[in-house]
């Protein structure tokens, strides 16, 4: 759990539950654990690295100098690169599933438009996708036994990708309540950790039994928990995924086919929510959905919690948060804080080069340099990067209780009830983390997609104020700086107290909020990286009010 100065800290920024120290090296027995039936697996595992080599001839002298500089400062950061291994799996027969929705069938549904012309009912390329659905017996698992549940896989038959999902109906009025897609970050962390550790209907106790969660987000919404990208959680593939844009089309296909199978949900308001690296995912996924004018997805808003969206702005706030300017005592001494100040200029210069080119050759060294120079000093203290108030517990993920979740989901009876097809569940897959970093995805400017979203839907950026890794200072700063049509009015808006309004704790201050036009920012008091985990009551309070339209036009 300690950082070596010669390692690349790729697990350091933006995982909902990724370990704060992750050495870049080949997993033991990696080749042995690959799925032997994939003939092109060896090639696919090294795809991001091969793509980097293909671009070698395009290197300018300046970029070559940057790589030389990073190699000299952090000698060993690029040693022993290995890309993701496939997960062992056994596909269940079609007879196991209650429904199989063929994308090719949906693709071939034509309707007549207002001009009397024939057009497809929904847009997008769906012919390669199928959706498998199984009704989950809640009584067999003891999780929200009175709530209808479905689980299954989205299959991309063309690219051998299989994404697992688990759907819970609203506890309140599923016929009218909104539907929410929840995404954890990483990249490479399962959204089932969000389900059982944060905002789902149950947590898992020491006895590996479900414990009812009265603050679950399915109190007033139906929720889909999705394991993506592939090879995360119960999802699997013989190939690797290494960039956010590739996952966006998968998510669009899943939602389109799901709402086709269950049209009773398709007319209801739909929202996408997530945290951490979902600051990359959500702008991309929402943009993909909105790009299809003919769709059955009634997208109304997005919510990003403690996200990484604009690294150029957000990395500036690691020193202030670690050194006592974020509302909590300093974790680092003055000498270390000054060294972080000295490194900031070079870091921002590298990130700007990444923004300008969006090439892996500029984005990868920016990630290496900035993570080592600005996150490394904090990590070496052993303090929890997801909560400045706590030490990192004796766990690879800083929270020992997460082991209960993995133990529960690895039980044969649970996997059978859910229709899981892999041989084991892991909360986070750090090979995926490497893939995304070496594709350059980590530092790319996903905030540039947000102005387009704001033209059509409301956007909420919320942040627990005790988080270091995607802290509230940086999230407030990038939303303040964002160039969009309502920028001036938003920038002039002051933070106001956020209080509980509708229960016995009415009047209790839970944070601060500023909102103008379609953009809203919230600071949540006492919340770490995972606000629903640290502040469940406050989490459900702001979530219900946001879904209810309080801060939206």
Curated annotation (Swiss-Prot):
Cite the source lineage.
Answer: Eukaryota, Fungi, Dikarya, Ascomycota, Pezizomycotina
Q: Which gene encodes it?
A: cpyA
Glycosylation sites recorded in the entry for this protein: 220, 518
Q: Where, per UniProt, does this protein localize?
A: Vacuole
PANTHER family given in the database record: SERINE CARBOXYPEPTIDASE CTSA-4.1 (PTHR11802:SF113), SERINE PROTEASE FAMILY S10 SERINE CARBOXYPEPTIDASE (PTHR11802)
Task: Name which cysteines form disulfide bonds.
Answer: 189-428, 323-337, 347-370, 354-363, 392-398
* Record keywords: Carboxypeptidase, Disulfide bond, Glycoprotein, Hydrolase, Protease, Signal, Vacuole, Zymogen
Q: What terms describe the molecular function in GO for this protein? A: serine-type carboxypeptidase activity
Task: State the protein's name.
Answer: Carboxypeptidase Y homolog A
Q: What are the recorded Gene Ontology BP terms?
A: proteolysis
């Amino acid at each position: 759990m300690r950082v070596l100065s010669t390692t690349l800290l790729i697990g350091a920024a933006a995982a909902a539950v990724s370990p704060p120290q992750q050495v870049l090296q080949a997993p033991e027995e990696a080749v042995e654990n690959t799925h032997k039936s994939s003939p092109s697996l060896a090639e696919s595992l090294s795809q991001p690295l091969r793509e980097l080599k293909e671009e070698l001839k395009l290197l300018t002298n300046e970029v070559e100098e940057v790589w030389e500089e990073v190699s000299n400062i952090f000698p060993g950061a690029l040693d022993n690169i290995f890309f993701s291994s496939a997960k062992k799996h056994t596909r269940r027969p079609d007879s196991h599933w209650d429904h199989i929705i063929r994308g090719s069938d949906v693709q071939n549904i034509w309707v007549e438009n207002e001009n009397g012309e024939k057009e497809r009912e929904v847009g997008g390329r769906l012919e390669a996708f199928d959706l498998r659905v199984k009704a989950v017996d809640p009584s067999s698992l003891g999780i929200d036994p009175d709530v209808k549940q479905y689980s299954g896989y989205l299959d991309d038959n063309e690219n051998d990708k299989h994404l697992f999902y688990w759907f819970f109906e609203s506890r309140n009025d599923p016929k009218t309540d909104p539907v929410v897609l929840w995404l954890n970050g990483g990249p490479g962390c399962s959204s089932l950790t969000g389900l059982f550790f944060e905002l789902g209907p149950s947590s898992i106790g020491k006895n590996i039994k479900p414990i009812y969660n009265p603050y679950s987000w399915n109190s007033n919404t139906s929720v889909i928990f999705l394991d993506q990208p592939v090879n995360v959680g119960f999802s699997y593939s013989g190939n690797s995924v290494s960039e956010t844009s590739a996952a966006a089309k998968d998510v669009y296909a899943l939602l389109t086919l799901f709402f086709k199978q269950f049209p009773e949900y398709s007319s209801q308001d739909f929202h996408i929510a997530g945290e951490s690296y979902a600051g990359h995912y959500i702008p991309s996924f929402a943009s993909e959905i909105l790009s299809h004018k003919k769709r059955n997805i009634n997208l109304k808003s997005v919510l990003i919690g403690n996200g990484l969206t604009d690294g150029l702005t957000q990395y500036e706030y690691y020193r202030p948060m670690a050194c006592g300017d974020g509302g909590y005592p300093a974790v680092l001494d003055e000498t270390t804080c000054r060294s972080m100040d000295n490194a900031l200029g070079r870091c921002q210069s590298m990130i700007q080069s990444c923004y300008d080119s969006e090439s892996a050759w500029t984005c990868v060294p920016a990630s290496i340099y900035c993570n080592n120079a600005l996150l490394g000093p904090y990590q070496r203290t052993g303090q929890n990067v997801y909560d400045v108030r706590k030490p990192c517990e004796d766990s690879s993920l800083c929270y020992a209780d997460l082991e209960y979740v993995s133990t529960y989901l690895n039980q044969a009876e649970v996997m059978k009830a859910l229709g899981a097809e892999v041989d084991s569940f892991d909360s986070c897959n750090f090979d995926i983390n490497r893939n995304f970093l070496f594709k350059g995805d980590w530092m790319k400017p996903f905030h540039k997609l947000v102005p387009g979203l704001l033209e059509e839907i409301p956007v909420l950026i919320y942040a627990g104020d005790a988080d270091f890794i995607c802290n509230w200072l940086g999230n407030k700063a990038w939303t303040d700086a964002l160039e969009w049509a309502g920028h001036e009015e938003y920038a002039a808006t002051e933070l106001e107290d956020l209080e509980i309004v509708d229960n016995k704790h009415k009047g209790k201050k839970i944070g601060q909020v500023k909102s103008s036009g379609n953009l809203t920012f919230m600071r949540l008091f006492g919340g770490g990286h995972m606000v629903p985990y640290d502040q469940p009551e406050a989490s459900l309070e702001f979530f219900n009010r946001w879904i209810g339209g309080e801060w939206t036009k």
